[in-house]
Amino acid sequence: MSSVVVVGAQWGDEGKGKITDFLAQKADLVARYQGGNNAGHTVVVKGKEFKLHLIPSGILYPDKTCIIGNGVVIDPGVLIEELKYLESEGISADNLRISGRAHVIMPYHRRLDEVEEERRGANKIGTTKRGIGPCYVDKIARVGIRMADLLDPEEFRARLEQNVAAKNELLEKIYGVDGFDAQAIFDEYRAYAERLQAYITDTSVLLDDARKEGKNILFEGAQGTLLDIDHGTYPFVTSSHPIGGGATVGAGIGPTTINKILGVVKAYTTRVGEGPFPTELNDEMGDLIRKAGHEFGTTTGRPRRCGWFDAVIMRYSVRVSGLTCMAVTKLDVLDQLPVIKICVGYRYQDEVITHFPESLKKLAQCEPVYEEMPGWMSDTTGCRTMEELPEKARRYVKRLEELCGCPALLLAVGPDREQTIELGEAF
């Protein structure tokens, strides 16, 4: 038995979907442990692109059990649309299981997300307005509705009526917008419950049984380390824990059951939304990387902010997630660059710092200290072994390993499942 956690080591969008899909070949179960449909992952199999938001990437394999864990917040309407999408592509979701402890995104969560972001004005945090944050707020406030509650009409109605009364007062009196009809929501979500009932179970027991049977388990995170509610660039963060430790809480398994934690990191850096970004390139080079890497959000379509690789960030991710290895993605995006820069530290006032600062104000004042490396100026998309890579590309990867203190396990040289270089075994 082996358990591997896949986490984003930057600000999300690192290519976790592709890496999870690749590793899922040798896994028996694939479990998603946090986030919601604010995150998207794209998987390319034999040139065919699949875009998913809630269902784990492992669903593309017919023999894998896929789990949506208790740490995920679920919009049932979105989930059902995703099931229909997979069905239209000839992919069965019979092996999907959903934790009854996962919290449910309600229509009032989406409305609150929208009006609160509008109220912030210039201080907006860049939410996707899909109700993720407000759903997690209700979870912490202990007034949330869980998937298991949807299956109990009496319990669901009681919780819903109480919540709608409170949310309507907030929406109407504070934000000046219309509230909701509890009966309409009840009818809509009971229909969702009927559709999803067969998938809902105690997934913690399922995972524990699999562990005892010696099966390989892959845990899939969403977003990235720097979007973690505690360890990210607060307040420009998500509402959950994308770091390695989030897997144990969000899937209902003990920390001693984890064998490897793999951090997925791009060969450069991107960010969506607001907040400081020390290596950001607001010039032609940034545009070039954005176009070459097709850097537009899976969920929002927003253009991603692009910059050079930041080793300060990666060392931070190694520390807070306990990364044992890394997967470097989109190495091919750098194929035609004559010079490539790596941020090795930050210049703050009169000193150079090598640790990621806690203060957002301090981070915003940091200037990157760069180390330059020669580009390889050749196509890597057909490479399948380390030896096939150009020497300068191999040197670049080696330097990233040295600066981050983390060995590379996988290299991605294109979006397709086959465009992956294995340097070691995950399971």
Swiss-Prot record:
UniProt cross-references to NCBIfam families, sorted A to Z: PRK01117.1, purA
UniProt pathway annotation: Purine metabolism; AMP biosynthesis via de novo pathway; AMP from IMP: step 1/2
Native source species: Heliobacterium modesticaldum (strain ATCC 51547 / Ice1)
Active site positions, chain numbering: 13, 41
Sites where the protein binds Mg(2+): 13, 40
Enzyme Commission number, as recorded: 6.3.4.4
Name used for this protein in its record: Adenylosuccinate synthetase
Binding of substrate, residues: 298-304
Pfam families tied to this protein: Adenylsucc_synt
Residues engaged in binding IMP: 13-16, 38-41, 128, 142, 223, 238, 302
Domain of life: Bacteria
Assembly and interaction partners: Homodimer.
Record's cofactor remark: Binds 1 Mg(2+) ion per subunit.
